[in-house]
């Protein structure tokens, strides 16, 4: 992936991106807390940044409120070192997109690609899916599903992709065999022992109510946070960005050993309903994207795919989001951490707090694929 232009950090206020990231996770997670899940709010945010650049009036204010965008659509975050991102806008060849919108896409760092949805819909969608698959190293396939209604009326698809691969710091974990994981039975566990005098300690704490550990990676400020509450569903229900930020920013350096399972989490599907519940309504109905094109458009659907795999070497994570537009006229300290029960995980920048991936694990064993 090519680097995006130099951009300003996300404003991590409760009203900004951080609030969106946690609320988006909660909206999707509420119905599937009985299975593993990972999402990338950051990928969704970046895809909608391209939509925000073309929005006007009440639609613009709606997106601004939900996602925490600033006044200037070109002022966006650049990903942390080690996190690769790419943006593309797939546009109908003969549709009247405004030159100023194309300029905004360039300043955001998005590549405009022209396809013919009307005359060769299948080839256009195949090209979009191939691009997303390539940018995510083959981890996100068929982003726009094959059963998505075929039709000539698609006019634009805005796509963001994200990829991360990190090796554990200060050392790789070791496999330690099977351990019992609450609610799921035996699972393959890995351990990191830092009990020697010359070893650094990790940030974290352990108690019967809440166990938290920060797992850093080499050559990046991104870290994986494992957050194991007494009861995961209750914890997720009450979770806020402010609470999450407080938990991960006040950890002492006292963890000398970590045991946790190998785990994998995935997601692929539409997130339109979750976004509607968060307040994105006009964009899906009486939309005003008059800064985007000379003809009226609305968002028909939003497809999201995410993947995260953790093993003894580190973490591989990828995500992609596609926002599909159609014309309105066609609308239809000596602490040991043992992670042995359902937990929340967050892949985030340790300094800025930017959340790249967030999810939970209730069964670490099914379908595990080593990196």
Swiss-Prot record:
Molecular-function GO terms, alphabetical: serine-type endopeptidase inhibitor activity
Give me the Gene Ontology terms describing cellular component.
extracellular space
Q: Tell me which domain of life the UniProt entry assigns to the organism this sequence originates from.
A: Archaea
What Gene3D superfamilies has UniProt attached to this entry?
Answer: Alpha-1-antitrypsin, domain 1, Antithrombin, subunit I, domain 2
Give the range the annotation lists for the signal sequence: none
Which residues does the annotation list for site: Reactive bond?
328-329
Q: Does the keyword Transcription apply?
A: no
What sections of the protein cross the membrane? none
Which SUPFAM superfamilies does this chain map to?
Serpins
The UniProt keyword set, sorted, is:
Protease inhibitor, Serine protease inhibitor
PANTHER family from the entry?
A: GH10112P-RELATED, SERINE PROTEASE INHIBITOR, SERPIN
Member of which family? Belongs to the serpin family.
User: In its UniProt entry, what is this protein called?
Assistant: Uncharacterized serpin-like protein PAE0049
Give the source lineage, highest ranks first.
Answer: Archaea, Thermoproteota, Thermoprotei, Thermoproteales, Thermoproteaceae
């Amino acid at each position: 992936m090519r680097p995006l232009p130099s951009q300003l950090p996300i404003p991590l206020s409760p009203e900004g991106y951080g609030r969106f990231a946690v609320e988006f996770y909660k909206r999707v997670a509420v119905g599937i807390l009985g299975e593993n899940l990972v999402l990338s709010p950051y990928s969704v945010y970046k895809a909608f940044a391209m939509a925000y650049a073309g929005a006007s009036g009440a639609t613009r204010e709606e997106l601004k409120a939900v996602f925490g965008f600033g006044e200037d659509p070109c002022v966006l975050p650049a990903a942390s070192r080690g996190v690769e991102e790419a943006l593309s806008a797939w546009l109908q060849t003969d549709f009247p997109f405004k030159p100023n919108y194309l300029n905004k896409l360039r300043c955001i760092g998005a590549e405009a690609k022209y396809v013919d949805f009307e005359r060769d819909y299948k080839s256009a969608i195949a090209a979009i899916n191939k691009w997303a698959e390539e940018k995510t190293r083959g981890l996100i396939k068929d982003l726009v599903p094959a059963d998505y209604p075929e039709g000539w009326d698609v006019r634009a698809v805005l796509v963001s992709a994200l990829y991360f691969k990190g090796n554990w710091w200060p050392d790789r974990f070791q496999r330690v065999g099977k351990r019992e994981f609450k609610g799921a039975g035996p699972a393959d566990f890995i351990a990191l022992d830092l009990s020697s005098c010359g070893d650094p300690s990790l940030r974290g704490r352990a108690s019967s109510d809440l166990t938290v550990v920060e797992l850093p990676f080499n050559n990046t400020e991104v870290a994986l946070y494992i957050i194991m509450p007494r009861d995961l569903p209750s914890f997720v229900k009450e979770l806020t960005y402010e609470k999450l930020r407080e938990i991960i920013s006040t950890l002492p350096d006292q963890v000398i050993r970590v045991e946790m399972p190998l785990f994998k989490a995935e997601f692929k599907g539409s997130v339109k309903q979750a976004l509607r519940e968060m307040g994105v309504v006009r964009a899906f109905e009486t939309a005003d994207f008059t800064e985007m094109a000379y003809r009226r458009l609305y968002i028909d659907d939003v497809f999201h795919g995410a993947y995260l795999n953790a093993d003894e070497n580190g973490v591989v994570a990828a995500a992609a989001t596609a926002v599909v537009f159609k014309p309105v006229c066609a609308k239809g300290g000596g602490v040991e951490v043992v992670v042995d029960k359902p937990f929340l995980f967050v892949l985030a920048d340790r300094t800025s707090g930017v959340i790249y991936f967030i999810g939970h694990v209730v069964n670490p064993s099914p379908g595990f694929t080593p990196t």
